[in-house]
Structure formats: C-alpha cells, structure tokens
C-alpha cells in the first residue's frame, strides 16, 4: 500500500481555479501570437466566455483579495500582450481583423474592472480608466462609435472623483467622448463635453492645448458637415480653440494651487502650429460665409507670426479667393504669384488656384497664368495646361473673343513645349480633344472662321505617327468643310488634298466633288465622282449626298448622273441608303424640271413599272400610307406628263405616259372606285393621244397599236359606269360626259381601221351614244363629220349623227345655232353626194326645207351670218344645172328656196332684189306654169337683174 493511500489529501482547491487556469492559458496564447496557431477570433471568443463566467461568479460572491490580485496580474499581462500585438506588423490586416484585436484589447480593462480595485496597486482606478480610454479610441478609429462610447462611459466613473494627479485621464476621456459624439452627429453633446472639460484643462498648459485641439477637431467636423444647429457654430469653436491657445501660452495660466507633480515647473507647450491651424480654419469658415474681410483679418494675423517659408499654402489660396470675392483682382493676382512662389504649395494646388482665378479674371489673363504654371510645374506642366485651358473653355460664354484667347493661349511655343515627350501622350490627346470639341461647338453655331482657327490649333497636339493618321485626316477634312462654308474654295481644296494624302478615302473624294460643284466646274465634279465610286470604302450614300449637293448648286447634269449611277447599284442582296423607289422619284423629279426630258422620264417610269411587276407593289413602293403615297406619286406624275406631252403635241410620249398612269392606278386598291375611274380615264386618254399622233404624223397606226388600242378601250368600257360622280357636280359630270364621248369617238375610229367593214357596228355605236345622257349636239356633229370622211366613209352613220345633232340641239332650251348650221351644211353636202330615195335633188331639198323651217322666226343675228349666206347661195346655185338641162321646174324650185331663205336671213337684204328679178325673168321665160314647191306667195313687184352664182363653201 502506498503512503498516499494511507494518508489522503484533504485540502480543498482554491475557488475559481478552473477559470483562472483558462484565463492564464488564454493570456499565454495572446502573448505567444508569433508562434501560436490560435486564431484571433478563437482568442476573442475564449475571452468573452471567461469574462461571462467571471461576471457570473462575481455576482454570486465577491472575489478574495488573492483572486483579485491574480486577475489583475493576468489582466495586466493581457494588456501588455495586446500592445505588443498592436505594434507587430505580422498582425496587420483589414477592418475585420482589427475589430477582433480591439475586442481582445477591451478584454483587459474588463478583467480589471471585474477584479475590483485591490489594495497595494497605485492609481488602480486611473489605470483601468486609461485602459478603457485607449480601447475606446481603438473602436473609434474603426468607426464603431457605439462600442467606443461604451468604453468611455465605463471609464468615466472610475476617475470622476479622482485625485488631482489623475484628473488628466478624466480630461482625455471627456475629449474622447466629445469626439465620439461628434462622429455620431451629436455636435451639441460634443460641445457640452468640451465645455465640461474647461475646469480640467485649466490645471495645466498641456490640458489647455489638448482642449484647444478638441475644439479645433469638433470645429473641423462641424465645418465639414455644415451642421444646421444654430447653437453650434464652427466659428465659435475655432474662437474657443484660439482663446485656449492664448491662455495656455500665457505664463499666468498655470494655477499656483496646482503644483506640478514632483515640484517641477510646468513647461509652456509650443502652440504656434495649433494657433495657425485655428486661424486657417477660421479663415475657411469665414470664406464659406462670404465674409471676405474676416478672411483677410485671419490671414493677416497668421502671417504676422511667420515667414514666407513657413506659410501654409492654403493661406495663399484663401487670400486669393477673398480678394476675388472683394472684387480686387490686382491683389488676387499678387496672391496667386505668392502662392506659386511658395515651395510648400503642390502643383495640383497651384493649378486649382489658377483655375479659380481664371474663372473670375476671364480668358484675357489665361496666357499669363499658363506661362507662370509652365515655369512652376516641372513634372505636371502638361496636365496643368490642360486644366487651365479647360477652365477657360468652361468659364462660360462661348463667344468669339474667348475662342480667340484660347487659340492664342494654346499656340504659344512655351505651352506647346510642355507636351513634348512620350510621357505626355495622354495630356496631348486631352488637349486636342478640348480644342476639337470647342471648335465643333463653334462649327455647330456656324462660326466657321473661329471653328477653323481652333481646329487648326488643335493639330499642334496631334503627333505625326501612324496611330494619329486618322485624327490628322479628320482635322484636315473639318478645316476643308469650314473653308467651304466660308467660300474659301481654293483653301478648302488645299486642306482636302492634304487629307487625301494622309488618308485617302471616300470622304475626301466627296469633299472634292462638293468643292468643284460650288466652283461651277462640272467636268471636274464628274471626274471626282468617278474617283469616289472607285474608292475602297465606297458607300452608296455618298452618291445621294452628291445628288443633294448638285441640286443645291443647280448642277442638273451631276445630280442626274449620281442618281442614275446609284440606281444601277440596286440589287436584292445589297443594302442601300434609300429605297429604290425614292431614287427613281428624285431622279424623275429632277428631270421634270428641265425641258425636253420626256424620253428620260419615260425610261425611268417604265423602270418603276417593271420593278413593281418584278418585286411586287408593297416590296417596291412600300406598305401602308407611305407606300400608297409613293405609288400615287408615280401615277399622278405619269398622268401629268401625259397632259404636258399632249399639250406640246408630243403625242408619242403622251400616249405611253397615260398607259403607264393606268398601270399605276390599277396596281393597288383595285376595289376602290376612285382608282378604277382614274384607270378608265387614263386608258381613254392613251388611245386619244395615239389617234392624235396618227393624225399629226400622217402615218397610219400599226396593227399592233390598233389591237392595243382596242384592248384598252374594251378595258375602259367596263369601267365607264364608274366615271359618273356619285354626287352630281356640274364640272365632274361634264368631265365624265367628255370621257364617255372620247371613248365612243375612239372606238369609232379604231373600228374603221380593223381591216373588215364595220359600218353597222359604227352606226350602232353612235346610236348608243346618242341615247345616253352624255350626248351633246357638238359631240354628234363631230361624229357625223368624222363618219363622212376617210377612205371608207360611213354615210349612214354620218347622216344619223348629223340629224341627231340637229334634233338634239333644237330640243335644248338654248339651241346652239352655230352647231345646227354646221350640221345642216354637212347634211346638205351628204345629201348632194348620195341618192337616199332614188332622187338626189329631193334629199338635198329636204335638208334646205328643214333649214328654212328652222330660220323662220329667228331673231336677227341668231343664225350665223356666214352659214346663212352659204344656205342662200347653195340653194340658189342648185338651180344652175337644171337650167342648163332645161329643167325649168326644178330650177324654179331651187331659186325659190334660195329667195325664201334670203328673206329670213341677215346679210342678204341687198341681194333679194336682184334674186327676185332673176326669178321673175325665169318664170316669164318658162311660162306661167305654177310652182309646186313655192313656200310663199311670189312678190308682186317685178325685179329685173341677175344674181351672180355664189361659190359653194
């Protein structure tokens, strides 16, 4: 048996030994961070667990003195280890890692606070408060204001009633709490904490300096945040900071009742730097408030205590801005020069100040400022120049004067020299872009002279390497366009030639075409257009542009040629800039402005018809309203060209134009009555013009033309009912009647050319027309005259037409006696040429007898004089042949008819006497045989004499 078994251990382990062991192990892990593989997150978790356990144990029973001392020793070791970890670069990490380290740091004062204040530890409460203060600052640096405030609030009660030597910790806590409140946005609390710290700061100059720094820090935050609380003003905070600096610098500021620790005399801190910072921020606050005099006062005070080499660069910037705000540009210029002479001023600050100065001074001062910057900025001179030029450009007012100042500024050799070297490639490109954009703005404003100047200066910043070739060519082309707009055509040609040398392409070729057109050199324009078509980067759109340019220059030939060539490029696969139908329309529109172009217009109209047949109506003209407009344009154009050609007696063209019009009108909306009516009219007009061409050219129609005409009239005949207007309108009805007559007349004409006799059909055609409402006496007269002419006259049709003409005319309310007289004459001539009833004389006599019945009772002058004279003379002369044949009875009948007509017609009164004498002589010679054909009783008076035989008219 072992001794231990005989004498067992009855001693109890100390309380909380397990917690102490865990804590000791955790502290050891924290201390051995270089060799330990324990993750900081695990260390923080272990410490949280231990703190929770200790807090639970402390709540149940108080710690013994020895346990408190143990915890204090371990807490102190933990703090020292945390400090070592913070100083180690091996643990540097991101915000998350720093937050874990801050949590480990805070565990040390938490342990000390749990352990209580043991006896024998000097200033234990102040030490714990200091640890909490530094832990809170760590959280504050990480932006965790809530955790920082919690640390400060735990520390404050520990030292709030501390002895004099520990009051410094309380001051630091108040300043830290003020900073946390400021970061949280509670500026009022921050100011209250600072005010609460004034008695603490009064104990020593260092305390006053710390409080002044606190006021300055809170003032900066207030100024940056532009706090809206009127009770918290940045200027008040800066003034408080200045006052504290003054008190701290005063020898009487240290209280005799607060002797320094160890009996040493307090040393006055160096507050000049802090005072200058306060003055700078106070000047900045006054500058934001636009109190320019206040700014200048602050700067004077600041400068009174320092030399030029010590002046902060912001002083010069604020002084310059204050003088600008006061309107004193001369002093502002001096301040800018002083700033540039300050070695502490960065190049960026100098450029920013120059920008602000130029914004107020205007572009006139830019040259001087930029030259000064060129001398000041060694490394970033090009970037500075870019910023200055941009400020001048963006300074407002894009006038010509500003542009001229920019051009002079960027063309200075010293400025251009800043951009030399490969290191300034970016700045060089930026400067070029600035000038290019400025130039294009003036170009859009049509300030072409100014635009050309700026674009030309921008080329100073374009290198001549291969990469910049395209940019240089663009500049040359824009310069050419500017000079074209200014009508400096020779100069424009020089620039475009340079552009072509740098980068030959279609844009240059087009500009040459444009220049030649404006110079009126059409031959050269033609040559350049051919060159343009042969370019590698040829685009059909440039032919469209050429056509527009040629039209504006009134160069008809070039415009037509460009559109004609463009038309030849259309195919199913190739994308084109505009629809083929639009090209055809523009081309025809151009041709229609010039005389004698009917053949060309007809050619392209035929092409439109053919393409419509090949592609389909919608594929060629387009769909919807736009397509309908295009189609109607071609239809109306064909109709109008047909009318124009007919008016100019170019019947060959006119007929085909009307035929094309019919095709266009019939190609869409076949069910539309209006379109079908137009088709009918166009077909009738086409045949009408065809017959007119035959008559004008005195050449008979070919069999194919006759066949085509018959087909067109047959097609039109089916559509004739659609011509009549749905709403009776006099003008529309008259037009419809005219087309119905033309259809009848043309049909009659073509029937006579068919090669086979068609007299019955012709007669029936006229009868049908005579029975229609469209028939007029004038129409029937024309039909009758036409039927009586030609190689194969249709006498029956002629007689019917003429008789119907007379009947229709007499039946009207206002008979047209000129038409009636013409019909009577033609009918009389017909009667003289044929034997209707076996007796030629009887038929003719019937006509004259009808004429006599018509003229009896007419007013004087109502019947045409010349026609009346013809009737009288013809009737009288009809007696000549019977007299020679000794047919006295027939002769007497005709002489009597002539004499009776003369008595009722105007213009024959002077001849009645001689006619009466001749008639009486005839009766005397032939005996007293009664006249069976007498119309009236013979005159009682005997008239001797003879009447000359009138000529048959």
Curated annotation (Swiss-Prot):
Residues 248-269, 924-953 are annotated as: Disordered. The keyword Repeat applies. It comes from the Eukaryota. This is TPR repeat-containing protein ZIP4. One of its GO terms (cellular component) is nucleus. It holds the Pfam family SPO22. Disulfide bonds: none annotated. TPR repeats lie at residues 129-162, 432-465, 473-506. Required for crossover formation, complete synapsis of homologous chromosomes and bivalent formation during meiosis. Is specific to recombination events resulting in interference-sensitive crossovers (class I meiotic crossover) and works cooperatively with MER3 to promote crossovers. It is found in: Nucleus; Chromosome. Keywords: Chromosome, Meiosis, Nucleus, Repeat, TPR repeat. GO terms for biological process: female meiotic nuclear division; homologous chromosome pairing at meiosis; male meiotic nuclear division; regulation of synaptonemal complex assembly; resolution of DNA recombination intermediates; resolution of meiotic recombination intermediates. Residues 943-953 have a biased composition (Polar residues).
């Amino acid at each position: 048996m072992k001794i231990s078994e005989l004498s067992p251990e009855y001693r109890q382990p100390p309380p909380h030994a397990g917690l102490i062991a865990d804590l000791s192990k955790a502290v050891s892990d924290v201390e051995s961070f270089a060799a330990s593989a324990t993750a900081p997150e695990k260390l923080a978790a272990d410490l949280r667990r231990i703190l929770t356990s200790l807090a639970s144990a402390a709540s149940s029973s108080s710690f013994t003195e020895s346990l408190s001392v143990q915890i204090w020793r371990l807490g102190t070791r933990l703090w020292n280890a945390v400090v070592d970890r913070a100083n180690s670069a091996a643990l540097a990490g991101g915000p998350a890692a720093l937050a874990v380290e801050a949590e480990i740091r805070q565990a040390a004062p938490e342990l000390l606070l749990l352990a209580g204040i043991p006896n024998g530890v000097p200033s234990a409460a102040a030490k714990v408060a200091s640890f909490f203060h530094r832990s809170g600052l760590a959280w504050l640096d990480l932006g965790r204001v809530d955790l920082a405030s919690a640390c400060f609030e735990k520390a404050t009660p520990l030292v709030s009633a501390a002895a004099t030597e520990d009051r410094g910790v309380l001051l630091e806590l108040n300043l830290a709490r003020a900073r946390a409140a400021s970061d949280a946005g509670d500026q009022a609390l921050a100011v209250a904490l600072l005010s609460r710290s004034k008695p603490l700061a009064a104990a020593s100059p260092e305390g006053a300096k710390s409080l002044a720094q606190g006021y300055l820090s809170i003032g900066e935050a207030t100024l940056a945040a532009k706090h809206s609380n009127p009770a918290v003003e940045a200027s008040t905070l800066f003034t408080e900071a200045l006052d504290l600096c003054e008190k701290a610098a005063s020898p009487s500021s240290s209280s005799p009742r607060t002797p320094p620790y160890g009996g040493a005399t307090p040393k006055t801190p160096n507050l000049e730097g802090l005072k200058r910072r306060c003055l700078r921020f106070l000047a900045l606050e006054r500058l934001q408030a636009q109190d320019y005099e206040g700014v200048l006062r602050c700067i004077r005070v600041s400068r009174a205590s320092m030399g030029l080499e010590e002046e902060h660069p912001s002083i010069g910037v604020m002084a310059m801005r204050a003088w600008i705000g006061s309107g004193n540009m001369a002093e502002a210029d001096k301040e800018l020069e002083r700033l540039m002479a300050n070695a502490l001023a960065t190049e960026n600050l100098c450029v920013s100040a120059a920008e602000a100065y130029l914004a107020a001074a205007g572009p006139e001062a830019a040259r001087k400022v930029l030259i000064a910057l060129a001398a000041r900025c060694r490394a970033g001179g090009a970037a500075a120049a870019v910023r200055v030029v941009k400020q001048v450009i963006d300074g407002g007012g894009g006038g010509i004067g500003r542009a001229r100042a920019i051009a002079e500024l960027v063309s200075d050799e010293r400025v251009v020299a800043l951009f030399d070297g490969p290191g300034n490639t970016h700045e060089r490109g930026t400067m070029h872009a600035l000038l290019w954009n400025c130039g294009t703005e003036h170009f859009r404003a049509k300030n072409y002279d100014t635009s050309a100047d700026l674009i030309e200066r921008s080329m100073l910043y374009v290198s001549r390497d291969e990469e910049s070739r395209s940019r240089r060519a663009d500049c040359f082309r824009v310069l050419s366009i500017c000079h074209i707009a200014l009508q400096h055509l020779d100069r424009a040609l020089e620039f475009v030639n340079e552009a072509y040398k740098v980068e030959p392409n279609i844009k240059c070729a087009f500009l040459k075409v444009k220049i030649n057109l404006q110079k009126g050199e059409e031959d050269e324009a033609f040559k350049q257009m051919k060159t343009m078509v042969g370019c590698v980067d040829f685009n059909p759109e440039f032919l469209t542009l050429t056509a527009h340019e040629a039209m504006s220059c009134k160069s008809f030939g070039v415009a037509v040629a460009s559109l004609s060539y463009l038309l030849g490029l259309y195919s199913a696969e190739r994308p084109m800039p505009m629809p083929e139908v639009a090209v055809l329309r523009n081309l025809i529109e151009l041709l229609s402005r010039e005389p004698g172009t009917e053949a060309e217009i007809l050619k392209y109209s035929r092409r439109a018809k053919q393409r419509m047949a090949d592609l389909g109506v919608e594929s060629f003209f387009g769909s919807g309203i736009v397509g309908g407009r295009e189609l109607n344009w071609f239809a109306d154009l064909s109709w109008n060209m047909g009318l124009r050609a007919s008016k100019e007696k170019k019947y060959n063209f006119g007929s085909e134009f009307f035929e094309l019009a019919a095709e266009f009108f019939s190609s869409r909306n076949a069910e539309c009555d209006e379109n079908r009516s137009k088709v009918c009219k166009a077909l009738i007009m086409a045949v009408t013009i065809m017959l007119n061409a035959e008559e004008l050219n005195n050449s008979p129609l070919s069999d194919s033309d006759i066949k085509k005409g018959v087909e067109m009239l047959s097609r039109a005949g089916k559509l004739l009912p659609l011509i009549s207007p749905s709403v009776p309108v006099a003008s529309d009805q008259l037009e419809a009647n005219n087309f119905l007559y033309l259809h009848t007349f043309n049909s009659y004409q073509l029937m006579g050319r068919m090669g086979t006799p068609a007299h019955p059909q012709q007669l029936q055609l006229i009868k049908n027309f005579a029975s229609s409402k469209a028939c007029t006496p004038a129409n029937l007269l024309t039909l009758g005259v036409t039927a009586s002419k030609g190689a194969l006259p249709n006498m029956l049709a002629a007689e019917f037409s003429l008789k119907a003409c007379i009947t229709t005319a007499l039946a009207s309310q206002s008979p047209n006696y000129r038409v009636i007289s013409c019909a009577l004459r033609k009918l009389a001539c017909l009667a003289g040429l044929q034997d209707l009833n076996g007796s030629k004389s009887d038929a003719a006599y019937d006509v004259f007898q009808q004429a006599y019945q018509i003229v009896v009772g007419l007013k004087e002058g109502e019947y045409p004089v010349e026609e009346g004279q013809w009737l009288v003379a013809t009737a009288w002369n009809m007696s000549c042949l019977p007299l020679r044949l000794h047919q006295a009875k027939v002769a007497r009948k005709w002489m009597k008819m002539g004499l009776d007509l003369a008595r009722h017609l105007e213009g024959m009164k002077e001849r009645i006497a001689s006619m009466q004498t001749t008639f009486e002589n005839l009766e005397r010679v032939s005996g007293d045989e009664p006249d069976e054909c007498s119309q009236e009783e013979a005159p009682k008076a005997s008239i001797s004499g003879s009447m000359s035989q009138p000529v048959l008219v």
